[in-house]
Amino acid sequence: MPIIAPISRDERRLMQKAIHKTHDKNYARRLTAMLMLHRGDRVSDVARTLCCARSSVGRWINWFTQSGVEGLKSLPAGRARRWPFEHICTLLRELVKHSPGDFGYQRSRWSTELLAIKINEITGCQLNAGTVRRWLPSAGIVWRRAAPTLRIRDPHKDEKMAAIHKALDECSAEHPVFYEDEVDIHLNPKIGADWQLRGQQKRVVTPGQNEKYYLAGALHSGTGKVSCVGGNSKSSALFISLLKRLKATYRRAKTITLIVDNYIIHKSRETQSWLKENPKFRVIYQPVYSPWVNHVERLWQALHDTITRNHQCSSMWQLLKKVRHFMETVSPFPGGKHGLAKV
């Protein structure tokens, strides 16, 4: 006769499913023991089959009788947290929004020691800096390089953003919208992180005498197709050359809208004169100091990450050969798997 209360069929199925899915083998053993006892096996047989002591089976029976299946689950390893974890994580998230200087400290950046001091001052706890360091990832806080910016707000930002959103909403085959920008290609490689053996820093050979080349690119906001032209100077002629390329490529378009930054070549007399002669083109200037508005910036970042960082080219023609191959294979962007393409 079973020595535990009868287990319903649905509950037995849930217990069997938990045994199959759980990664906790001790929890699986306890569930198996209860199912064997329900089947009518003796405690001695269960202990022998599961390689455990009879006293352990008796303890599991008490847990199951008092709390059901939940009572058989394993407790977390280690001792319980001594301090209010959630409350302290909330404080950490609020503190990192400010600078230590806001609280009278001379440091410009937070350290774990300083965070621990401030948390202890607010809560009255006695946290160690090492504990704060372990808790930071759980609070969603990571160590990252900051990005420079200016506290200058474009007074016409809302109007410009409204015009950009309206153009994007109306994007179609007859009215395509492009993100446009220029990028500098340097012969001297940009230095970036790479996988390397500990203590053996990689060396990147540089030509020494730098050379430059410039690309003007347009990213179709709908299809992700990339169009670009190159030149030896970043001038109005380069921008106009790209406009001519778009005009020839999208002959059936009734209007062509470009979202550009406020660089001088986009507003020069030469550019304005060409735009007057080609009313098909419409230029929308993004808000000042808002590069994230222009999605073609992501394309240039991908170009640098894929080609120009740590490159081994000794001459500009070798580097430009790789750059042109990248620009030919990057469409549609994003999603073209440019990082896996072969030469």
Curated annotation (Swiss-Prot):
Entry GO MF terms: nucleic acid binding
Disulfide bonding pattern of the chain: none
Record protein name field: Insertion element IS630 uncharacterized 39 kDa protein
Keywords: Transposable element
InterPro entries, per the entry: Homeodomain-like_sf (IPR009057), RNaseH-like_sf (IPR012337), RNaseH_sf (IPR036397), Tc1-like_DDE_dom (IPR038717), Transpos_IS630-like (IPR047655)
Originating species: Shigella sonnei
